[in-house]
Amino acid sequence: MALATLDWMSKDAERLAQCNHDHPQAVLGPQQLEDGRWVVRVWMPEASRVVLLHQGHEHALENPHHAWIFEGELSSNPGSQYRLRVERAGITHEQHDPYAFRQEWMGAMDRHLFAEGNHHHIWQRMGAHPHLQDGVAGVQFCLWAPNARSVSVIGDCTNWDGRHLPMQQRIGGIWELFVPGLGAGAHYKYEIHTQQGHCYEKADPYGFQHEVRPAQASVVASLKGYQWGDDAWLKQRDNRNPLEQPVSVYEMHMGSWMHGSWDEPYIEADGTPRAPVPAADLKPGARLLTYPELADRVIPYVKARGFTHIELMPMAEHPFDGSWGYQVTGFYAPTSRFGTLDEFRAFVDRCHAEGIGVILDWVPGHFPKDAHGLAFFDGSHLYEHGDPRIGEHKEWGTLIFNYSRNEVRNFLVANLVFWFEELHIDGIRVDAVASMLYRDYLRPDGEWIANEHGGRENLEAVRFLQQANSVLFHYFPGALSIAEESTTWPLVTMPTSMGGLGFNLKWNMGWMHDMLDYFELDHWFRQFHQNNITFSIWYAHTENFMLALSHDEVVHGKSHLLHKMPGSDELKFANVRALLTYMWTHPGKKTIFMGMEFAQRGEWNVWGDLEWDKLQFPEHQGVVNLVDDLNALYKSEPALWRNDFDSFGFQWIDCDDTNHSVVSFMRRDEKEGNWVVVVCNFTPEGHGNYRIGVPVDGFYTELFNSDGARYGGSNQGNLGGKFSDDWGMHSYGQSLDLCLPPLTVMVFKHDPNRQREAAKDEAAAKLGGSLG
């Protein structure tokens, strides 16, 4: 094989050796010379010998121009169908040449849509994809880093040396490289050399899997191959309006719900133990459960409690456990703490098989400064604003996305679609929406910049949220999009076509604060704070509200729900039961945080797990029973959920009895004409003959009583129900004479089929005697 006579440009060799080349395919791989001949140039750092294998022939390559550039002449273009036998440090291996594969991965339309901010499936192009090119298996890498001087793929395959696999720059700041021979499971990062001469090692922003913390590399993972079993669930979900369904959510943090033992590792399907992931230093010997173990334990538990959905605190990859998941570095990857991408999919799949929806906390408002993450990604403020007055949350130590940049919005909007399309989640809760909407959020005067109109509103963030919700509901009309928005920003749950942000639910932070403030009061002072109980109804229909008692209310010295309550243990438990029952009967969808369903005593601690030992005590088990029955009642009575968001669904009977701290109201279902009566006594004083007005004559069945013995109460009540009396009250022609136990909420329903004599005989039987 004759040596090529091409005068090699030494500057290209030096640029390659210094990781400073942005178009390696211009000089590497098959190259046609001016006279029509072909030369193959191979970049092989630290190799001592390279032999080209093609069509049954071996061609020893030489390196006359640089020690690491091997070249040889061929009579025709070999394309990508040649292999290289490489000797390095006494070891010989064969491989394909990455620079022989020249097919552009990102097409012109992909680049156009991405630059426009409208490529809703950009993850199918960006990132690392196991792929077959020209019949050769490998991994296609694609990265956006428009301000980088050069980018290399580094990993186990290069001994983490950026000189081996420089990437090819394309139009629009896209960098690509197909690496033959790699596959799923390969660890990698991008080595980015900046215009200023600095070098950063970055995880893949679009990586689908990452190493377990504290390691930081991305892991090649295929999105293909998992066989979903939830087609019927998804079809049903997207054919109905979730606002017209019961929604009862169990919010949980996977890493602190329950731990396993270090001495009892998870056993893989092939019988080998999986390396345990330590839970925390504060609990020696504890390990995190895996996705399969969590599926085995969480799903039956949540189903038994009767919840319709699980809300998972952020599951995207994050380096620090103490952030609870809210400081994300891997937006496109379920955290590897608990297992693999497909194991997370299987968790969701099993939830759907058991009739449980999955809501994910999504964090598009900020990201951490970790060196391997998005911060200063390509030597420029690529994902964040450069000015800290609009680009940084100093109190949180995080950076704010630059929503005015199309590609950044595209990254986030497509990420939302990704979690629904590839991982089949059913809803999102967007964290800290207020921090996105206001430029002066947690900022003193002088440390924020007004918008172009002189206001404090972040108009770019508004447009981003509107775009995200519009795209979400375009693809997934039955999805839930929930805003944690703590201010009075208008139209949060109005459609974007009407000027709203486009969410379909908003956490009712006002209700939560009013309720907790009220229930923390000494019982006898509650009469002076009746407005805390009643005020939420006056604005209940201004947004589509979700009532939430979340993780934020049981940390940082706030104490858990039980210990917010006044009085003895007996009174505390009665208060918890009353609060939860009032919550389930109040307009709005429901969310409670893990541990509240059994009245955990201690604060939530991300480093530990729940106080499962408390379930051996009857008072705690009683709260579990209460939640079980509340969810069953809630789902069986459309009056409690169908008209949550219009005024027809709620009617006060009496909200003015401040002396007794008693309120009563009706919940109504317009579609079927059903209605229930709710009576609440929020003091430890019972009332033997408490009368409320009702609209219809007849028998009122006592459907629910939070003082029931099954719940740990005193079991006082109304012997299953009461007939109304022809005694007008509260603007109604009929009334009920009720027994109201202390600190109790009761639910009644009119039964048109019950006759007075039959009810009288039944009551006598319950008393063990006759009623005159």
Swiss-Prot record:
It catalyses: Transfers a segment of a (1->4)-alpha-D-glucan chain to a primary hydroxy group in a similar glucan chain. It is an enzyme of class 2 (transferase). Pathway: Glycan biosynthesis; glycogen biosynthesis. Its EC number is 2.4.1.18. The active site is at D431, E484. One of its GO terms (biological process) is glycogen biosynthetic process. GO terms for molecular function: 1,4-alpha-glucan branching enzyme activity; cation binding; hydrolase activity, hydrolyzing O-glycosyl compounds. GO terms for cellular component: cytosol. Keywords: Carbohydrate metabolism, Glycogen biosynthesis, Glycogen metabolism, Glycosyltransferase, Transferase. Catalyzes the formation of the alpha-1,6-glucosidic linkages in glycogen by scission of a 1,4-alpha-linked oligosaccharide from growing alpha-1,4-glucan chains and the subsequent attachment of the oligosaccharide to the alpha-1,6 position. HAMAP family: GlgB. Monomer. Belongs to the glycosyl hydrolase 13 family. GlgB subfamily. This is 1,4-alpha-glucan branching enzyme GlgB. It comes from Synechococcus sp. (strain RCC307).
